[in-house]
């Protein structure tokens, strides 16, 4: 399986984390932020993460990716759901982008390896 991803993407991290817990090998392909063509060629639009299954079929929803990876062999995500933790995470979603987004392009991440990719990210976030 191949995961098209950004290093700074929390949805990508979710998929990578369950794959690591399972010991499932993923080919991780970091896409530069301004490379919309790679995403569009696979699924017709700009979206990350994209999990390409061994049969070539793409998956777009990170929770579906997590469920698929966890279904291979013995599952590791077997504990009870914790609604109180989910509620805390939901509240954090309101403020986290304001704290993290301005810092991402300052980090030496592969999705920002070119000036054009970094500038593309900054313009997209300013317009959002």
Regions found by a protein language model. Give the residues of each.
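A conserved mid-domain beta-alpha-beta active-site/ligand-binding segment of alpha/beta enzyme cores
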Residues: 122-128
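GST-like domain detector, emphasizing the conserved glutathione-binding G-site
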Residues: 1-122
